[in-house]
Amino acid sequence: MLKRYLVLSVATAAFSLPSLVNAAQQNILSVHILNQQTGKPAADVTVTLEKKADNGWLQLNTAKTDKDGRIKALWPEQTATTGDYRVVFKTGDYFKKQNLESFFPEIPVEFHINKVNEHYHVPLLLSQYGYSTYRGS
């Protein structure tokens, strides 16, 4: 009986794992923040995804970075469409929690999505008085 239970448990886990991996891969947008001053990930930073609209920006989703400075799935559950987007990193609050000043209270990074079947990764290398970003993989 125990052997049958173990076999069923392993089989169930094996079939579930591809579904979990596939769900994470289907999300087309991820971000990652590294603090260049400490060399460590920037955890608990609020990041907002917005789409360019006729009269400004339309908020699509908001999330916080995990302990590794990542949001692995920032795109909302709705279907992706081509267009102009931006992620806004709320960095002022991050530094304020550490009793540090920052020149940039927010860092908006605009980008264009032209292929909804590709993955887009936006890394942010951050310090109190500067930042760098690029299209990651």
From Swiss-Prot:
InterPro entries named in the record: Hydroxyisourate_hydrolase, Thyroxine_BS, Transthyretin/HIU_hydrolase, Transthyretin/HIU_hydrolase_d, Transthyretin/HIU_hydrolase_sf, Transthyretin_CS
Principal location listed in the UniProt entry: periplasm
GO cellular component annotations of the record: periplasmic space; protein-containing complex
Coiled coil: none
Induction of its expression: Induced by H(2)O(2), via the HprR/HprS two-component system, and by Cu(2+), via the CusS/CusR two-component system. HprR and CusR bind to essentially the same sequence within the hiuH promoter region.
Localization: Periplasm
Lineage top rank: taxon: Bacteria
EC number assigned by the record: 3.5.2.17
GO biological process: protein homotetramerization; purine nucleobase metabolic process
Catalytic activities: 5-hydroxyisourate + H2O = 5-hydroxy-2-oxo-4-ureido-2,5-dihydro-1H-imidazole-5-carboxylate + H(+)
Gene3D superfamilies found in the cross-reference section: Transthyretin/hydroxyisourate hydrolase domain
Signal peptide extent: 1-23
Residues holding substrate: H32, R70, Y134
Keywords, comma-separated and alphabetical: Hydrolase, Periplasm, Purine metabolism, Signal
GO molecular function: hydroxyisourate hydrolase activity; identical protein binding
Entries under Pfam families matching the protein: Transthyretin (PF00576)
Family as reported in the entry's similarity comment: Belongs to the transthyretin family. 5-hydroxyisourate hydrolase subfamily.
Alphabetical list of NCBIfam families matching this protein: hdxy_isourate (TIGR02962), PRK15036.1 (NF011610)
Quaternary structure annotation from Swiss-Prot or TrEMBL: Homotetramer.
Function of the molecule: Catalyzes the hydrolysis of 5-hydroxyisourate (HIU) to 2-oxo-4-hydroxy-4-carboxy-5-ureidoimidazoline (OHCU).
Protein name (database record): 5-hydroxyisourate hydrolase
